[in-house]
Protein backbone atom coordinates (compact mmCIF):
# COMPACT_ATOMS: atom_id res chain seq x y z
CA UNK A 1 0.00 0.00 0.00
CA UNK A 2 1.32 3.45 -0.96
CA UNK A 3 2.45 5.73 1.80
CA UNK A 4 -0.03 8.69 1.98
CA UNK A 5 2.67 10.97 3.42
CA UNK A 6 4.86 10.33 0.38
CA UNK A 7 1.96 11.20 -1.93
CA UNK A 8 1.43 14.49 -0.10
CA UNK A 9 5.15 15.30 -0.25
CA UNK A 10 5.28 14.57 -3.99
CA UNK A 11 2.26 16.81 -4.55
CA UNK A 12 3.82 19.64 -2.50
CA UNK A 13 7.11 19.23 -4.34
CA UNK A 14 5.36 19.55 -7.72
CA UNK A 15 3.43 22.61 -6.50
CA UNK A 16 6.66 24.20 -5.26
CA UNK A 17 8.36 23.54 -8.61
CA UNK A 18 5.49 25.03 -10.60
CA UNK A 19 5.33 27.99 -8.23
CA UNK A 20 9.07 28.69 -8.53
CA UNK A 21 8.90 28.48 -12.34
CA UNK A 22 5.95 30.91 -12.44
CA UNK A 23 7.73 33.28 -10.06
CA UNK A 24 10.86 33.18 -12.21
CA UNK A 25 8.95 34.09 -15.38
CA UNK A 26 6.90 36.76 -13.60
CA UNK A 27 9.98 38.54 -12.23
CA UNK A 28 11.92 38.03 -15.47
CA UNK A 29 9.13 39.70 -17.47
CA UNK A 30 8.70 42.48 -14.89
CA UNK A 31 12.44 43.16 -14.87
CA UNK A 32 12.45 43.26 -18.67
CA UNK A 33 9.73 45.90 -18.81
CA UNK A 34 11.26 47.96 -16.02
CA UNK A 35 14.79 47.88 -17.45
CA UNK A 36 14.32 47.75 -21.21
CA UNK A 37 10.99 49.47 -21.82
CA UNK A 38 11.53 52.27 -19.34
CA UNK A 39 11.22 55.64 -21.07
CA UNK A 40 14.30 56.84 -19.18
CA UNK A 41 17.02 54.31 -20.03
CA UNK A 42 19.30 53.27 -17.22
CA UNK A 43 22.32 53.37 -19.45
CA UNK A 44 23.10 57.03 -20.10
CA UNK A 45 25.92 57.91 -17.73
CA UNK A 46 28.66 60.50 -17.47
CA UNK A 47 31.17 58.15 -15.85
CA UNK A 48 31.97 54.50 -15.30
CA UNK A 49 31.53 55.10 -11.57
CA UNK A 50 27.87 55.93 -12.23
CA UNK A 51 27.57 52.72 -14.25
CA UNK A 52 28.96 50.74 -11.34
CA UNK A 53 26.60 52.43 -8.88
CA UNK A 54 23.63 51.61 -11.09
CA UNK A 55 24.82 48.04 -11.51
CA UNK A 56 24.75 47.69 -7.72
CA UNK A 57 21.13 48.87 -7.73
CA UNK A 58 20.16 46.52 -10.57
CA UNK A 59 22.32 43.43 -10.05
CA UNK A 60 20.47 41.38 -12.68
CA UNK A 61 21.51 43.67 -15.53
CA UNK A 62 24.66 43.68 -17.64
CA UNK A 63 25.73 46.97 -19.15
CA UNK A 64 26.96 46.92 -22.72
CA UNK A 65 28.41 49.70 -24.85
CA UNK A 66 27.04 49.68 -28.40
CA UNK A 67 28.97 51.60 -31.03
CA UNK A 68 27.12 52.35 -34.26
CA UNK A 69 28.77 53.64 -37.42
CA UNK A 70 26.39 54.82 -40.10
CA UNK A 71 27.90 55.06 -43.62
CA UNK A 72 24.88 57.06 -44.79
CA UNK A 73 25.95 59.91 -42.50
CA UNK A 74 28.02 62.56 -44.28
CA UNK A 75 30.54 62.65 -41.44
CA UNK A 76 30.34 58.89 -40.82
CA UNK A 77 29.69 59.72 -37.17
CA UNK A 78 29.89 57.11 -34.44
CA UNK A 79 27.02 57.08 -32.00
CA UNK A 80 28.02 55.46 -28.74
CA UNK A 81 25.76 54.73 -25.79
CA UNK A 82 25.36 52.43 -22.82
CA UNK A 83 22.26 50.30 -22.59
CA UNK A 84 21.23 47.75 -19.98
CA UNK A 85 21.06 44.21 -21.33
CA UNK A 86 18.74 42.00 -19.29
CA UNK A 87 20.67 38.83 -19.98
CA UNK A 88 23.72 37.90 -21.98
CA UNK A 89 21.33 36.10 -24.33
CA UNK A 90 19.80 39.39 -25.45
CA UNK A 91 20.33 39.50 -29.24
CA UNK A 92 23.50 41.39 -30.09
CA UNK A 93 23.94 43.19 -33.37
CA UNK A 94 26.54 41.98 -35.85
CA UNK A 95 28.26 43.75 -38.75
CA UNK A 96 26.02 44.40 -41.77
CA UNK A 97 23.09 42.27 -40.68
CA UNK A 98 19.85 43.52 -42.30
CA UNK A 99 17.64 41.00 -40.50
CA UNK A 100 18.50 42.79 -37.23
CA UNK A 101 17.16 46.10 -38.54
CA UNK A 102 13.96 45.88 -36.54
CA UNK A 103 15.85 45.16 -33.31
CA UNK A 104 18.29 48.01 -33.95
CA UNK A 105 15.37 50.34 -34.61
CA UNK A 106 13.73 49.21 -31.37
CA UNK A 107 16.87 49.92 -29.34
CA UNK A 108 17.44 53.30 -30.96
CA UNK A 109 13.83 54.26 -30.32
CA UNK A 110 14.21 53.47 -26.64
CA UNK A 111 16.86 56.13 -26.22
CA UNK A 112 14.91 58.61 -28.35
CA UNK A 113 17.46 58.93 -31.13
CA UNK A 114 15.93 59.64 -34.51
CA UNK A 115 17.46 58.20 -37.66
CA UNK A 116 16.12 57.43 -41.13
CA UNK A 117 14.76 53.90 -40.98
CA UNK A 118 16.14 52.83 -44.35
CA UNK A 119 19.71 53.74 -43.37
CA UNK A 120 19.82 51.60 -40.21
CA UNK A 121 20.21 48.31 -42.08
CA UNK A 122 23.44 49.64 -43.63
CA UNK A 123 24.99 50.45 -40.29
CA UNK A 124 28.15 48.68 -39.27
CA UNK A 125 27.70 47.72 -35.66
CA UNK A 126 30.36 46.69 -33.21
CA UNK A 127 29.74 45.71 -29.62
CA UNK A 128 32.16 46.69 -26.89
CA UNK A 129 31.75 45.82 -23.25
CA UNK A 130 32.76 47.85 -20.24
CA UNK A 131 32.81 45.09 -17.67
CA UNK A 132 35.07 42.02 -17.94
CA UNK A 133 32.45 39.54 -16.74
CA UNK A 134 30.27 40.53 -19.70
CA UNK A 135 33.24 40.55 -22.08
CA UNK A 136 34.11 36.97 -21.19
CA UNK A 137 30.73 35.80 -22.47
CA UNK A 138 30.81 37.80 -25.71
CA UNK A 139 33.22 37.61 -28.62
CA UNK A 140 33.74 41.36 -28.68
CA UNK A 141 36.63 43.72 -27.97
CA UNK A 142 36.79 45.11 -24.44
CA UNK A 143 36.92 48.81 -23.61
CA UNK A 144 39.45 50.09 -21.12
CA UNK A 145 38.04 52.44 -18.48
CA UNK A 146 39.48 55.46 -20.35
CA UNK A 147 38.01 54.31 -23.66
CA UNK A 148 34.64 53.72 -22.02
CA UNK A 149 34.70 57.20 -20.47
CA UNK A 150 35.54 58.70 -23.86
CA UNK A 151 32.72 56.71 -25.45
CA UNK A 152 30.22 57.98 -22.89
CA UNK A 153 31.37 61.59 -23.32
CA UNK A 154 31.17 61.27 -27.10
CA UNK A 155 27.68 59.84 -26.84
CA UNK A 156 26.46 62.65 -24.58
CA UNK A 157 27.76 65.26 -27.06
CA UNK A 158 26.19 63.36 -29.98
CA UNK A 159 22.87 62.86 -28.15
CA UNK A 160 22.75 66.58 -27.34
CA UNK A 161 23.11 67.43 -31.04
CA UNK A 162 20.37 64.98 -32.03
CA UNK A 163 17.97 66.18 -29.33
CA UNK A 164 18.35 69.78 -30.56
CA UNK A 165 17.21 68.87 -34.11
UniProtKB/Swiss-Prot annotation:
The keyword Disulfide bond does not apply. The keyword Transmembrane helix applies. The chain crosses the membrane at residues 16-36. GO terms for cellular component: host cell membrane; membrane. It is found in: Host membrane. Signal peptide: none annotated. Keywords: Host membrane, Late protein, Membrane, Transmembrane, Transmembrane helix. Its main location: host cell. It comes from the Viruses. Induction: Expressed in the late phase of the viral replicative cycle. It is a single-pass membrane protein. Belongs to the asfivirus F165R family. This is Uncharacterized protein F165R. It comes from African swine fever virus (strain Badajoz 1971 Vero-adapted) (Ba71V). The lineage of its organism: Viruses, Varidnaviria, Bamfordvirae, Nucleocytoviricota, Pokkesviricetes.
Amino acid sequence: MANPNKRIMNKKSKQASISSILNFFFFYIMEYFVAVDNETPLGVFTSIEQCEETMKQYPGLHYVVFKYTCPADAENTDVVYLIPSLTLHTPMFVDHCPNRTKQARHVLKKINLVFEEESIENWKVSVNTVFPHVHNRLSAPKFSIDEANEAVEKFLIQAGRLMSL
